[in-house]
Design a protein with these regions (language model features):
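Flexible, acidic/Gly-rich N-terminal and inter-domain linker regions that tether
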Residues: 1-83
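Well-ordered, non-membrane alpha-helical segments in soluble/globular domains
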Residues: 17-22, 118-124, 154-158, 211-220, ...
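A short acidic (Asp/Glu
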Residues: 21-22, 149-152, 182-186, 206-208, ...
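Alpha-helical scaffold elements within enzyme catalytic domains, especially in hydrolases
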Residues: 24, 99, 162-165, 223
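Conserved Radical SAM active-site core
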Residues: 62-79, 83, 101-195
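Local cysteine-cluster metal-coordination motifs and their immediate loop/turn environment
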Residues: 88-105
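Conserved radical SAM core fold
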Residues: 143-147, 178-181, 192-212, 237-242
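Conserved C-terminal portion of the radical SAM core fold
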Residues: 217-249
């Protein structure tokens, strides 16, 4: 997936306009138009006027800061928490999976990248120092694909380096893309897992628009293993349709 074919406008929060990461992202997306804003609501007001606000939200990029990054993975009321934690560096996703809850949850949320990485470093240090568990599991695939914007943001590469020397913590980066080239230029990390959501070719083609094919995902996982990364696979969702048993088998 080529992000510069998806993103047609860049909005920048004035508070971060001088951020080096903002400058790098804008440079990678030239000549995409750039507009400074003071509040997310300014962008949302424009999205409301679009014929298809959900589709339009996937074509605009918002570079901003985030007040807090680390949160417990949400679960249903009354359910026992799984102990998984999330890091929300990116919000929303350029992929167009028909069944994805983000389609409704982020109906007026532009593709959002938090650029205040130093704040995440500080928050993570304090979080790990205060957490008492043998192995802490944390990932970035809850509110957006972990690698869909990697070519322009470099956030996954940043996280791998950030977690490289952290003991007792396992970072998972989950994706439906094949965007791992930038991750293969540096040494792998023992505590980082690259994970792929898999489905049948029929579901990928019809319901997971913009994502990598099944073959591309599996080949990317092979490349990751060859480089020394641990990998994982998620079969989620499994969809019932005529012939599903054979195709999933």
């Amino acid at each position: 997936m080529q992000q510069n074919k998806w993103i047609k406008r860049i909005f920048v929060n004035r508070q971060v306009e001088n951020s080096p990461l903002v400058e790098r992202i804008i440079g990678r997306l030239k000549p995409t138009p750039v507009q400074l804003v003071d509040r997310l609501e300014e962008i949302q007001a424009e999205l409301r006027l679009a014929t298809d606000p959900i589709a339009e939200s996937k074509r605009v990029l918002f570079l901003t800061d985030e007040k807090a990054f680390i949160r417990p993975c949400p679960c249903s009321p009354g359910a026992v928490p799984c102990g998984y934690w999330t890091i929300d560096l990116n919000l929303n996703c350029p992929l167009d999976c028909s069944y994805c809850i983000l389609q409704a949850y982020f109906s007026l949320q532009p593709l959002t990248i938090a650029v205040n990485q130093k704040d995440l470093e500080s928050e993570l240090g304090a979080f790990l120092a205060s957490t008492r568990t043998k192995v802490l599991r944390i990932g970035t695939g809850e509110l957006g694909d972990s690698l869909a914007l990697e070519a322009i943001s470099g956030q996954a590469s940043f996280l791998i380096d950030l977690f490289r020397d952290k003991k007792g913590v396992l970072l998972e980066l989950k994706t439906k893309t094949s965007a791992i080239d930038s991750l293969l230029v540096s040494p792998p990390s023992e505590n980082v897992v690259l994970a792929w959501s898999l489905n049948t070719e029929r579901i990928i083609k019809v319901e997971e628009i913009g994502s990598a094919s099944l073959e591309e995902r599996v080949r990317s996982a092979e490349r990751a293993v060859e480089h020394g990364f641990k990998v994982a696979f998620h079969f989620d969702p499994i969809i019932y349709y005529s012939g599903w048993e054979k195709e999933y088998g």
